Amino acid sequence: MGKKQKNKSEDSTKDDTDLGALAAEIEGAGAAKEQEPQKSKGKKKKEKKKQDFDENDILRELEELSLEAQGIRADRDAAAVKPTENNEEESASKQDKKKKGQKGKKTSFDENDSEELEDKDSKSKKTARPNSEAPLSGSEDADDSNKLSKKGKKAQKSTKKRDGSEEDEDNSKRSKERSRVNSSGESGGESDEFLQSRKGQKKNQKNKSVPTVDSGNEDDDSSFKIKTVAQKKAEKKEREKKKRDEEKAKLRKMKEKEELEKGKKEQSKQREPQKRPEEEVLTLRGTPDTGAASEEKGDTAAALEDDNEGDKKKKDKKKKKTEKDEKEKEKKKGPSKSTVKAIQEALAKLKEEEERQKREEEERIKRLEELEAKRKEEERLEQEKRERKKQKEKERKERLKKEGKLLTKSQREARARAEVTLRHLQAQGVEVPSKDSLPKKRPVYEDKKKKKTPQQLESKEVSETLEISAPVEAVDQGGPEKEETPPSVEPEEEEDTEDAGLDDWEAMASDEEREKEGNMIHIEVEENPEEEEEEEEEEEEEESEDEEEEGDSEGSDGDEEDCKLSDEKDSGKAGDTKPSKDASSDSEYDSDDDRTKEERAYDKAKRRIEKRRLEHGKNVNTEKLRAPIICVLGHVDTGKTKILDKLRHTHVQDGEAGGITQQIGATNVPLEAINEQTKMIKNFDRENVRIPGMLIIDTPGHESFSNLRNRGSSLCDIAILVVDIMHGLEPQTIESINILKSKKCPFIVALNKIDRLYDWKKSPDSDVAVTLKKQKKNTKDEFEERAKAIIVEFAQQGLNAALFYENKDPRTFVSLVPTSAHTGDGMGSLIYLLVELTQTMLSKRLAHCEELRAQVMEVKALPGMGTTIDVILINGRLKEGDTIIVPGVEGPIVTQIRGLLLPPPMKELRVKNQYEKHKEVEAAQGVKILGKDLEKTLAGLPLLVAYKDDEIPVLKDELIHELKQTLNAIKLEEKGVYVQASTLGSLEALLEFLKTSEVPYAGINIGPVHKKDVMKASVMLEHDPQYAVILAFDVRIERDAQEMADSLGVRIFSAEIIYHLFDAFTKYRQDYKKQKQEEFKHIAVFPCKMKILPQYIFNSRDPIVIGVTVEAGQVKQGTPMCVPSKNFVDIGIVTSIEINHKQVDVAKKGQEVCVKIEPIPGESPKMFGRHFEATDILVSKISRQSIDALKDWFRDEMQKSDWQLIVELKKVFEII
């Protein structure tokens, strides 16, 4: 039986594999047969099959159903092992079903026909089997199938591919079933036939629309369907349900896997200890699936045992199976509560671990920071310790130098020369005291230390140099014995001293010093109370010597203090500082000697200057006052210079170019002139006038000269603000008020031009208050009205103002003095008020002080004198031959005063006068200083005097600090004009104008224009010809310089009035610009974008005349146009633009204009409609050259939107 079954199974497998080939043959054979004979033959076959039907077939069918149930379970196991394969097969089978269903719908056959078709197909497949029961039916089936192949050709084609895959699947199932059936007994012998029939039935179930019967033996179809169809449907529903559940479970698993992968990625960044809880989570999540698999295996085993019990048991199994499936679904739905809890606990542990590690990391970083801070503190303390040690060593060396115990190389050479001289003297027979005749040293050495060597008791020479060098020799030789250090230290100490200067040594060479030095030997060597007494004696000797050396009281005071300070330090540290030190420390401080010497000299000079200033500040004499410095400020043409002319009885204003003040001037007004001018003031006490006179400074009022106004106001004690009564406060008046506010300078207001009041009657010989009372009513009313208006304007500026004769509180109210520079009214009252206010309110400020305070006002080049500086001497005195430090363009300038020139009394400093030469000048004066190297002096900064050479570096540093701000103002450009002026003040004003006009300047100079200036300016011809210009303000132009400028092509503009120079240069720039615009007008292309109006096409070709809308930019005549959308075709040049039949030169954005575009010469004319359409945008054809020309010469005609369009077109034309 077993062999027969095996043979049968082998045959069945062979038949299954040959089905595809057999179907193809059947299709080919039966292509030409008709449908009706097929139906009739099919009925005959069915009748034969019914006859052969027997009871054994029913039993086999039941067994097959039970095996099928087992096969489903096996399928489920296989699906658990390989879920992906089943998914693919199921999806493929579903697609096949859909395709089959669609094809079935298309065909015109009904269900009965399709059923017959399937039956015959299945029978044809059975023909190949060597089944003993139905050999005839197999051959008949083959014949029938040949007949039916034509009819079922399409259906077979659609199912062909699906059959192949299903056969593979069924083969695997049959092999499993065979193994089970062999063990089940006799009923298993006929399982092969049942399996073959079940294969057909499964295909029918998958094809819902075409149910087929595929039994091996001839069965009765009707009786067979009644038994199995309901069961098949139920099983099919269960299978579909299970498949859905399995798909859901797979989706859940996929999601869980993704979540786990994300978690793994996040946790892999952390340390290895953190990975263990994650593994636990993974194992916990893996448990439900394994349990489910084991249960399934148990189910299949149970099912095999119960298969043979029959139909009743089968139903019970189905119920059990459905309950188990539900349980499995519940398990597959997700992890249980315990699993979730375990996962949460694992995650909590993981989080705690992270927090713990974070805390540990923070603590570690904190510890490291504390250790670092501790280390830095130790380093700082160590550094301080080293610095203290170094400072002590410096002080010791400094003291030794002061005492003359350290010898430099030059000093040793001098010592050798002195020895040679001594031998010569002895050879000539001069008596020289022997070493025995000299007094012995103190016995202190013998008490404390070893006995002296003979070298320490060498004789002292007679000459001064020998007297000086002997004690130092004793120190150098005696030092090593006392310190008990190796002899190698001695040469190193000598090396330290090599860099010390000879001057310090020679400065101390005097008789008293020799005695002192003899005693000073013991300072460094001994450490006892006697040493301090000796030091005190030596300090007194040093003080007396310094006084003799300095020769003047100021220097001696400073040196006494220095000596006391330094020696007090020395005596205080004498016990602490010990001479013992190793060779390394010597070499360490060896290089510091030069620096410390310079620093020492610098600090000494600084202390001396500070002490001198402090003493001068204390010795202020309030009884003796200096002349107050009065500054005159105001708007243009208010009468500032005219007021001064009236005071001085001069005509400076008439001699000025254009009547404009362009320089700062200073006038000395002596006491006699004050008394003369104030004789009409009755209550003026002329006997008690304490000021020796007045120094009045006149400043320019024009806008350009704000720097000079600022400079003049910065050094004045009191100011006169001149206001035109007819015009009130004007721009420069308000600027002057703000300057005075910022400087906190007191001022009085001169209400000038009262003679302009209607019916004013002048009375210069009387007080202005009396003169006002004498005027007519209408004149007084007008004056009061205008005065009140000006008081209101002052109130708007935050100042209280009142007429001087009504002012009860001059500290809170500004005094207004009505004046007339033309008639002289009010001049006496003005001077009286100035004298009164300065004597009473400014007595402390005007107190006589020896401390020098001076300020450079102007730098001028005078013929026959060279470059001179006008200086306002505020305090102190200046002497001829003094070393002065003045600020310069390239740094402070150190020079000597060669001459002090003063203008005659009541004469203007800036006007060329017969200057008086003085040896000494006292404050306050306007003085002209002659000296060397004053060409690059900067005005507006202080002048300092150095009484000693070592003070020069200190004073230089003071000036450098103040220089920085002024130097930042004058910055030269690489390309620009050359500027030349008579004074620095007017040069600054000219540069300020150029800066506001955005004109660069490449060179500046003060003085006449020479050939060298033309040479410098001619350099610009190579860079930019428009800047090859010299602006000469109020200076003479040499003839040879003018000739050279003409030959080279350099323009020289010269004017005495700054505004005329401005106008001339501005006109030149405009002309030059027009010339260049004319030159570049064909190159410069203005950007534009035009849209064609299709209803206004007047001419389409040669020339093109069309109406357009300017969308952006501006269209000008001569603009070349192109069409970017048509491969940048050039259509021509705009030659004419019309608006409302009127021709215009330019059309701007938003305008609708008619343009005539003529073709480019030498090119074929372009045509509207062929080369471009109405939809195309026309743009101007720009290039890099045209853009540069616009930037350089047509910038004023371009707007911001035009530049934006250029940027847009650059991208279109790809211009870099």
UniProtKB/Swiss-Prot annotation:
**Compositional bias (Acidic residues) spans?**
110-119, 490-510, 526-562
Which Cys-Cys disulphide bridges does the record give? none
Predominant place of localization = cytoplasm
Basic residues composition bias: residue spans = 96-106, 148-160
The PTM Phosphothreonine maps to: 107, 300, 497
Span list, region G3:
698-701
- Residue ranges with Low complexity bias: 19-32
What remark does the entry make about the cofactor? Binds 1 monovalent cation per monomer in the active site. Structural cofactor that stabilizes the GTP-bound 'on' state. May also act as a transition state stabilizer of the hydrolysis reaction.
- The UniProt regions of compositional bias labelled Basic and acidic residues, in chain numbering, are 7-17, 49-63, 171-180, 232-279, 322-333, 348-422, 433-448, 511-525, 563-584, 594-604
- One matching Pfam family, short form? GTP_EFTU_D4
Gene Ontology terms: cellular component: cytoplasm; synapse
Ranges for the region named G4 are: 752-755
Keyword list, A-Z? Cytoplasm, GTP-binding, Hydrolase, Initiation factor, Metal-binding, Nucleotide-binding, Phosphoprotein, Protein biosynthesis
Known InterPro entries for this protein? EFTU-type, P-loop_NTPase, Small_GTP-bd, T_Tr_GTP-bd_dom, TIF_IF2, TIF_IF2_dom3, TIF_IF2_dom3_sf, Transl_B-barrel_sf
Start and end residues of each stretch annotated as G2: 659-663
List locations, semicolon-separated: Cytoplasm
Q: Where is this region: G5?
A: 820-822
Q: Function of this protein?
A: Plays a role in translation initiation. Ribosome-dependent GTPase that promotes the joining of the 60S ribosomal subunit to the pre-initiation complex to form the 80S initiation complex with the initiator methionine-tRNA in the P-site base paired to the start codon. Together with eIF1A (EIF1AX), actively orients the initiator methionine-tRNA in a conformation that allows 60S ribosomal subunit joining to form the 80S initiation complex. Is released after formation of the 80S initiation complex.
Q: How does it assemble?
A: Interacts through its C-terminal domain (CTD) with the CTD of eIF1A (EIF1AX) or with the CTD of EIF5 (mutually exclusive) through a common binding site. Interacts with eIF1A (EIF1AX) from the location of the start codon by the 43S complex until the formation of the 80S complex. Interacts with ANXA5 in a calcium and phospholipid-dependent manner.
Name assigned to this protein: Eukaryotic translation initiation factor 5B
Source organism per UniProt: Mus musculus (Mouse)
The protein's gene is named Eif5b
